[in-house]
Amino acid sequence: MDDKKKKRSPKPCLAQPAQAPGTLRRVPVPTSHSGSLALGLPHLPSPKQRAKFKRVGKEKCRPVLAGGGSGSAGTPLQHSFLTEVTDVYEMEGGLLNLLNDFHSGRLQAFGKECSFEQLEHVREMQEKLARLHFSLDVCGEEEDDEEEEDGVTEGLPEEQKKTMADRNLDQLLSNLEDLSNSIQKLHLAENAEPEEQSAA
């Protein structure tokens, strides 16, 4: 029977000193915490504190260069832009101004002369050119397929098909030239602005 009691009783760990059976281990707790925490119950840090401990642990693990640090070697690195309230207010004001400019249409894309309306115009021209280009390809493929299926050319005579294809190609080239000119104007306006700033 004594052997069974010995087997059931927990064995004290060799690394920990043996404590008297009736004593509780007291954990020092600040007075701001509730009284129930002073009984030795485990106290888990809040998620905010855990993140802080992780951050401090990571910063301590970072190697410090011999002549590179401006602060002392024992102080953790801090991001001043996260703690400066005036910087946050300044960024907030800048973002609100940007949002107001966007809604009013005054927002400039590349310079004073280049607005989003011009960029929208260029984008629409690009889409129009792409549609025209692919519609020409599709029309050409459909006509070739019809000729192969029928064995005989139906519809328009060859000369009319050729003149229509030439007209579509001329339209495509003129639209492409307009697009090129619009993009060139945007680039010229963008390059002219830094020259004006350097001259002033």
Curated annotation (Swiss-Prot):
Keywords: Acetylation, Bardet-Biedl syndrome, Ciliopathy, Cilium biogenesis/degradation, Coiled coil, Cytoplasm, Cytoskeleton, Obesity, Phosphoprotein. One of its GO terms (biological process) is cilium assembly. GO terms for cellular component: centrosome; cytoplasm. InterPro entries: CCDC28. Pfam families: CCDC28. The keyword Coiled coil applies. The modification N-acetylmethionine is found at M1. PANTHER family: CHEMOKINE C-C MOTIF RECEPTOR 1 (PTHR13400), COILED-COIL DOMAIN-CONTAINING PROTEIN 28B (PTHR13400:SF2). Involved in ciliogenesis. Regulates cilia length through its interaction with MAPKAP1/SIN1 but independently of mTORC2 complex. Modulates mTORC2 complex assembly and function, possibly enhances AKT1 phosphorylation. Does not seem to modulate assembly and function of mTORC1 complex. Interacts with BBS1, BBS2, BBS4, BBS5, BBS6, BBS7 and TTC8/BBS8. Interacts with MAPKAP1/SIN1 isoform 1 and RICTOR. This is Coiled-coil domain-containing protein 28B. The gene is CCDC28B.
